[in-house]
Curated annotation (Swiss-Prot):
Full protein name: Large ribosomal subunit protein uL4
Recorded name of the encoding gene: rplD
Family designation: Belongs to the universal ribosomal protein uL4 family.
Alphabetized GO MF terms: rRNA binding; structural constituent of ribosome
Start and end residues of each stretch annotated as Disordered: 48-72
Length: 213
């Protein structure tokens, strides 16, 4: 079980919260997380790359020159893959790259990834009321009060639900990504230096993923 301190808008500790999610065993944890990460990255591929074979390129139905007697190499079509503007040999065609993974395994990987980042996890009180209007400077100052180095570190901010002012305040910060608890994913959990989560968002995560089902 890991215990995280809760910080308010000013960076002062206001309490503690326990994070004790059922995770994979030490022997299988890295592999389960790897499979979930691989699935997410592969499934994000569009798979729409497409090329034309020699039979699909427009033209090339007539033989360019007779077979023998010209002194040139024989050719049957101007759309041969050997020719400029010809077809493509073994080029990509639209395909589905989807990798399936059991729901229980996906949830296990997500819990394991989150629990493994507990040392980089910062829990804060709900601060929607602190941003009356979109103010990037105020959000940056809050991150610094919470102990995050904004100059060189990437941040994942997890909210219970979408907050317009918070989203607009963080929109032009290249090292900050804002997601809701319902969109939690393995890649974001592993790819950032710090994870900042609001108390209500963490409770929703524990409620959703805490039980083994």
């Amino acid at each position: 079980m890991a215990t995280c301190s809760i910080k308010d808008w000013q960076g002062n500790a206001t309490g503690e919260v326990d994070l004790d999610l059922p995770v994979a065993s030490a022997a299988t944890a890295s592999h389960v997380v790897y499979l979930a990460f691989k699935r997410q990255m592969v499934n994000s591929r569009q798979g729409t790359a497409s090329t034309l074979t020699r039979g699909e390129v427009r033209g090339g139905g007539r033989k360019p020159w007779k077979q023998k007697g010209t002194g040139r190499a024989r050719a049957g079509s101007i759309r041969s893959p050997l020719w400029r503007k010809g077809g493509v040999i073994f080029g990509p065609k639209p395909r589905d790259f989807e990798i399936k993974m059991n729901r229980k395994e996906r949830r296990l990987a997500l819990r394991t990834a989150l629990q493994s980042r507990v040392e980089d996890l910062i829990v804060v009180d709900e601060f929607e009321g602190q941003l009356a209007a979109p103010k990037t400077r105020e959000l940056v100052q809050a991150f610094e009060r919470w102990g995050v180095d904004m100059a060189s570190q990437s941040i994942l901010l997890i909210l219970r639900e979408r907050q317009t002012n918070t989203y607009l305040s963080a929109r032009n910060l290249p090292n900050v990504k804002v997601i809701t608890a319902g969109n939690l994913n393995v890649r974001d959990l592993l790819a950032t230096d710090w994870i900042v989560v609001t108390g209500p968002a963490l409770e929703l995560i524990k409620e959703t993923y805490g039980a083994v089902a």
